[in-house]
A protein has these predicted regions:
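Active-site neighborhood of HAD-like aspartate-dependent phosphohydrolases
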Residues: 1-45
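Hydrophobic "anchor" residues on beta-strands that sit immediately upstream
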Residues: 4-6, 112, 169
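A metal-dependent, Asp-based hydrolase signature
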Residues: 51-83
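Short, acidic loop-to-helix structural element flanking the phosphoryl-transfer center
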Residues: 85-112
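Conserved phosphate-coupling serine/threonine residues in phosphotransfer and NTP-handling enzymes
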Residues: 115
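Substrate-recognition "cap/lid" segment bordering the active-site pocket of phosphatases
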Residues: 118-169, 176-177
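Acidic, Mg2+-coordinating phosphoryl-transfer loop and its flanking beta/alpha structural elements
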Residues: 169-194
Length: 194
């Protein structure tokens, strides 16, 4: 019997906050370049804008409205969202995550990914992290592409149909949505809480 180990992406294989911070830096750079009447240099404006965005985020405010107000801009939220959603991050897996994936592959495990989110964002993260070294593209289920979100059974049943008679394990971080379906289907589950 072979083993299939599927992972969640955000806050399991990578920290979602790292994506958010790197995307915010890109947005801050974009906004700073559009601030024609600002007295600070673009680099200083980028740094201040990034700090302002993080403040707004942590206070639960609309980050993009706060950024526009801070810089005196009227950039459409859609423009900011386009940058956020299409941003190509440049970060790497933590060494211990790479070591784990290497060990699982060496042990003959088939690795998969089950992740909620927008296709472009999740694929950009997948590619930036180099996950294709361990996970075959056919073993990636992203909710927007697949047509259902966790905790739908369908996302997990996909792997059960693809690999009949395998032993399945799911590794995730969200007790509210990551474990209902795999537990119901008899999978082993591992919860990583931060």
């Amino acid at each position: 019997m072979y083993k299939v180990v599927c992972f969640d992406l955000d806050d399991t294989l990578s920290k979602e906050i790292k994506y958010l911070e790197s995307a915010y830096k890109e947005i801050a750079r974009y906004a700073a370049r559009h601030c024609e009447g600002c007295s600070d240099s673009v680099n200083i404006l980028e740094a201040k804008s990034f700090k302002e965005m993080l403040r707004a985020y942590h206070e639960g405010k609309n980050t993009f409205d706060e950024l526009n107000s801070f810089l005196g801009l009227s950039i459409h939220v859609k423009d900011y969202l386009d940058i956020y959603r299409n941003f190509k991050p440049t970060w790497q897996l933590l060494p211990e995550v790479s070591d784990l994936l290497n060990r699982l592959k060496e042990d003959g495990c088939i690795l998969g990914l089950i992740s909620d989110g927008r296709s472009v964002q999740q694929r950009n993260k997948f590619n930036a992290l180099g996950l294709n070294r361990w996970i075959n593209n056919n073993d990636v289920v992203i909710s927007e592409e697949f047509g259902s979100e966790k905790p739908s059974l369908a996302n997990y049943e996909y792997f059960m149909k693809r690999y009949p008679n395998a032993e399945f394990t799911y590794v995730g971080d969200n007790p509210k949505k990551d474990f209902f379906a795999p537990n119901q289907l008899g999978w082993n589950t591992v919860c990583l809480l931060d």
